[in-house]
Amino acid sequence: MSTIEERVKKIVAEQLGVKEEEVVNTASFVEDLGADSLDTVELVMALEEEFETEIPDEEAEKITTVQAAIDYVTSHQA
């Protein structure tokens, strides 16, 4: 099984149509990876599905970087 970090990066790459090597922990979804608001909503939905969790809208708005996504998923795993 892949680590949470690897799984998050794979989802980000797939959802945003970028190469996995571009998905570094410090990358901003919008500024560095070219995501728009719809992309970020779809990304959150993909993370919810992959990690079987629900991310409230107010929390989703704070997830703006790859590291923020990793941190959120790590802290909310059952």
From Swiss-Prot:
Residues 2-77 form the Carrier domain. It comes from the Bacteria. Keywords: Cytoplasm, Fatty acid biosynthesis, Fatty acid metabolism, Lipid biosynthesis, Lipid metabolism, Phosphopantetheine, Phosphoprotein. Pfam families: PP-binding. GO terms for cellular component: cytosol; membrane. Pathway: Lipid metabolism; fatty acid biosynthesis. One of its GO terms (molecular function) is acyl carrier activity. The modification O-(pantetheine 4'-phosphoryl)serine is found at S37. The keyword Lipid metabolism applies. 4'-phosphopantetheine is transferred from CoA to a specific serine of apo-ACP by AcpS. This modification is essential for activity because fatty acids are bound in thioester linkage to the sulfhydryl of the prosthetic group. GO terms for biological process: lipid A biosynthetic process. Its main location: cytoplasm. It is found in: Cytoplasm. Carrier of the growing fatty acid chain in fatty acid biosynthesis. Belongs to the acyl carrier protein (ACP) family. NCBIfam families: acyl_carrier (TIGR00517), PRK00982.1-2 (NF002148), PRK00982.1-3 (NF002149), PRK00982.1-4 (NF002150), PRK00982.1-5 (NF002151). This is Acyl carrier protein. The lineage of its organism: Bacteria, Pseudomonadati, Pseudomonadota, Gammaproteobacteria, Pseudomonadales. The gene is acpP.
